[in-house]
């Protein structure tokens, strides 16, 4: 179920305040955040956020296509190393 329109999107107050002050000064700094649940607002476009993935901070540059999504969607928490496959030197028998 989605969030109520009456409540509006969730954004950490400190995060939004930092972006508003940076927009007023027209400066672009990397904003470090642990708030993966914050929704990306149109004011965030053009800024870079360092989003924590549980281990380190992943830089996320916000574009217009990201508006409405959560910051955590762009900072993966798990490392996918691929499925187990055949070794390169082992060949299949009975080549047809």
Curated annotation (Swiss-Prot):
Q: Which InterPro entries match?
A: Ribosomal_uS19, Ribosomal_uS19_bac-type, Ribosomal_uS19_CS, Ribosomal_uS19_SF
Gene Ontology terms: biological process: ribosomal small subunit assembly; translation
Q: Which domain of life is it from?
A: Bacteria
Name the residues that span the membrane. Answer: none
Under the heading SUPFAM superfamilies, the entry gives:
Ribosomal protein S19
Question: Which molecular function terms from Gene Ontology are attached?
Answer: rRNA binding; structural constituent of ribosome
Please provide, in alphabetical order, the Gene Ontology terms of the cellular component aspect for this entry. Answer: cytoplasm; small ribosomal subunit
Record carries keyword rRNA-binding:
yes
Q: Which UniProt keywords apply?
A: Ribonucleoprotein, Ribosomal protein, RNA-binding, rRNA-binding
Please indicate if the UniProt record lists Transferase as a keyword: no
> What Pfam families does the annotation carry?
Ribosomal_S19 (PF00203)
PROSITE patterns per UniProt? RIBOSOMAL_S19 (PS00323)
Q: What does this protein do?
A: Protein S19 forms a complex with S13 that binds strongly to the 16S ribosomal RNA.
PANTHER family, per database record: RIBOSOMAL PROTEIN S19P FAMILY MEMBER, SMALL RIBOSOMAL SUBUNIT PROTEIN US19M
Entry similarity comment: Belongs to the universal ribosomal protein uS19 family.
Q: What is this protein called?
A: Small ribosomal subunit protein uS19
Upper taxonomic classification of the species?
Answer: Bacteria, Pseudomonadati, Gemmatimonadota, Gemmatimonadia, Gemmatimonadales
Q: Which gene encodes it?
A: rpsS
């Amino acid at each position: 179920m989605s969030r109520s329109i009456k409540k509006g999107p969730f954004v950490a107050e400190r995060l939004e305040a930092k972006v508003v002050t940076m927009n007023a000064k027209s400066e672009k700094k990397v904003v470090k955040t642990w708030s993966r649940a914050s929704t990306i607002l149109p004011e965030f476009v053009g800024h870079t956020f360092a989003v924590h993935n549980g281990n380190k901070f992943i830089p996320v540059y916000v574009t217009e296509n990201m508006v409405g999504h959560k910051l955590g969607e762009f900072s993966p928490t798990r490392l996918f190393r691929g499925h187990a496959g055949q070794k390169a030197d082992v060949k299949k028998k009975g080549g047809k």
